[in-house]
Amino acid sequence: MQHFGLRVPLNQAGYYETGHHKELMKDVRGAINEGGLIAVCGVVGSGKTVLLRRLQEILDEERKITVSKSLSVEKRSIKLATLIAALFYDLSTEKQVRIPSGEKRERELRDLVRKNKKPVVLFVDEAHDLNRHTLVELKRLMELVEGGGGRLAVVLAGHPKLRNDLRRPTMEEIGYRTEVFSLDGIAGSQREYIRWLLGACAGDKKEAETILTVEAIDMLASMLRTPLQIQMHLNLALEASYQSGERPVSVEVVESVLSRQIDDLEPTLTRHGYSVKDLVEQFDSKAGEIKALFNNTLDATRTAALREKMLRAGLPI
């Protein structure tokens, strides 16, 4: 990267904010103040984790709301006990945190939140992997805290699958009580993001056109949608251009590194949080059928039936 005058890796450029980010941040903060379940949904690489990390930093600095975070990485196996433990660890003032069992656990947590004398927000990342029972229990936990004179908000961050799951008829108890926000990331601002990214990593007023041609920037901006996609393909283009001794990076180099399958059905659904296993379970199908659908080898009648079900469920077909 030094060949192009970049001093910082592209994935460490910092926080990029659009008007959409500002509005979303304002709306989520308002929802946190009111308490309850909040879902922030965006595709893989749209910047959910970065945005929520920034939100947590702001809340910590203001000291008006106590921030708690679940650090467990095994989301599919998470139960309510894991999330309650996170609250105990972040709210307790004891050096050696002891989490009681049975009903005493909930009673002590309710007292902890009340004694905290500030609203509490629990952040849960990768929440699309949480099962229905855990979500229902979270709702009941918030009601328990509220009944004890405290206020607890839970921010669930996940892929669009989370939003679609919350809208399913079987999730009515949770979905109707959840405020859902969609993170569109840098949609509509890809060119501005590329210019900002190169400037932030160069550490000076270097013009983006000294690194990439205008045509190369335009192609990246028109073909890619998320910060993660842009960072990855920009890295590939810079490496290819360095190897060929070309500077600035041309549109031909960018075209040579762009993934041809980036908008195929399988990667699109994966970015929205759907694995083959998820699709099999939700649409009463078989793994072989789903793979055949991805490969365009499934018979027309079954393809039409599956696509109709997926469209009704909110999948981007």
Model-derived regions: residue spans:
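A short, basic N-terminal segment
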Residues: 1-35, 316-317
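Conserved NTP-binding/hydrolysis module of P-loop NTPases
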Residues: 4-8, 70, 74-97
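Walker A/P-loop nucleotide-binding motif
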Residues: 34-54
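Conserved Walker B catalytic segment
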Residues: 37, 107-156, 164, 168-169
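Short regulatory helix/loop adjacent to the ATP-binding pocket of P-loop NTPases
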Residues: 56, 162-177
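Conserved AAA+ ATPase "SRH/arginine-finger" region at the nucleotide-binding site
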Residues: 72-74, 178-190
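Conserved C-terminal "switch" segment of AAA+ ATPases
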Residues: 93-101, 186-215
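C-terminal alpha-helical "lid" subdomain
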Residues: 199, 203, 207-317
